[in-house]
Regions:
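Metallocofactor- and cofactor-centric catalytic cores in central/energy metabolism, strongly enriched
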Residues: 1-224
C-alpha cells in the first residue's frame, strides 16, 4: 500500500504520508518481536524514529545516496515499476483477485534495491523482470475488472453538465465507483467521472445506473485548480 501511496500525482497530504510512515514503523516493530535473530537483517529493516527525524533520514538514504549513476537509475526505474505493480494489485485485490507470485516479487525486488552487492547486470535483469511482472499485474487487473463489470464496449459519453447536484470520481478504483453509484440511487445526486475514470463508462455493468450521467473536465495536465 505504501508504494501505491507514493505514485506520481496521487497524494500531496503530508499528514497522511507521515501517518503511513508511523503505522509502517509500528507494524515493523511488532514483526521484529517475532523474529528470533534480528542480526541478519539489513539496517533498513531495523531503523525506527520519530517524525522530526524523518527528513534527516530521508537525506541519508534517499535516491542520491546511491553514488553510481547507472545503478541509481536502474534502482529508480525498478521502484517506479513496483509502484505501478502495487497499484494494479491493490485495485485487483479490491475485487477479490490476487496473485501471490506478484506479491512475492514485490518484496524481493524492493529488498534488491538496497542490496549493494548486486552489480549493474543484476539490476538490468531485475528491471526486465519488473516489466514482466508489470504485464502480469495488468492482466490480473483486467481479469478482475472484466470479471466484475463485463468487457468494455464502444460507448458515447456525455460531457455536459446537468442541473442536479453531482459527485466527481477520479482515479481507477471501479469498486469505489460502484459503491458510490449504489449509495446515490434515488437521492437526486448524479455521478460524473473525472480524468482517469473515463473508461468506467465503457463497462456494461455501470450502464444500468441512471444517475451515472457523464464526464466532466479535461486531461488533468490541462486543468487549473
Amino acid at each position: 500500500m505504501n508504494l501505491f501511496t507514493t505514485i506520481t500525482n496521487a497524494n500531496f497530504d503530508k499528514e497522511m504520508i507521515v501517518a503511513r510512515i508511523r503505522e509502517t514503523l509500528d507494524t515493523k516493530e511488532n514483526l521484529l518481536k517475532q523474529c528470533p535473530d534480528t542480526s541478519v537483517l539489513p539496517a533498513a529493516a531495523l531503523w525506527n524514529g520519530e517524525e522530526h527525524t524523518f527528513a534527516v533520514k530521508a537525506a541519508l538514504v534517499g535516491v542520491l545516496s546511491t553514488k553510481d549513476e547507472d545503478i541509481r537509475s536502474l534502482r529508480e526505474m525498478i521502484t517506479y515499476g513496483l509502484k505501478g505493480l502495487s497499484a494494479y494489485s491493490k485495485h485487483a485485490n479490491a475485487l477479490l483477485k490476487e496473485n501471490t507470485e506478484l506479491d512475492a516479487f514485490l518484496q524481493r525486488a524492493l529488498a534488491a534495491t538496497l542490496d549493494d552487492s548486486l552489480r549493474l547486470e543484476d539490476y538490468v535483469n531485475l528491471t526486465l523482470e519488473t516489466g514482466k511482472y508489470g504485464v502480469e499485474g495488468m492482466a490480473l487487473l483486467d481479469a478482475a475488472n472484466t470479471g466484475a463489470y463485463g468487457h468494455p464496449e464502444m460507448t458515447r459519453v456525455n460531457i455536459g453538465v446537468g442541473k442536479r447536484p453531482g459527485i466527481l470520481v477520479s482515479g481507477h478504483d471501479l469498486r469505489d465507483l460502484e459503491m458510490l453509484l449504489i449509495q446515490t440511487q434515488g437521492t437526486g445526486v448524479d455521478v460524473y467521472t473525472h480524468s482517469e475514470m473515463l473508461p468506467a463508462h465503457y463497462y456494461p455493468a455501470f450502464k444500468k445506473y441512471p444517475n451515472f450521467v457523464g464526464k466532466i473536465g479535461r486531461a488533468s495536465c490541462r486543468e487549473r485548480v
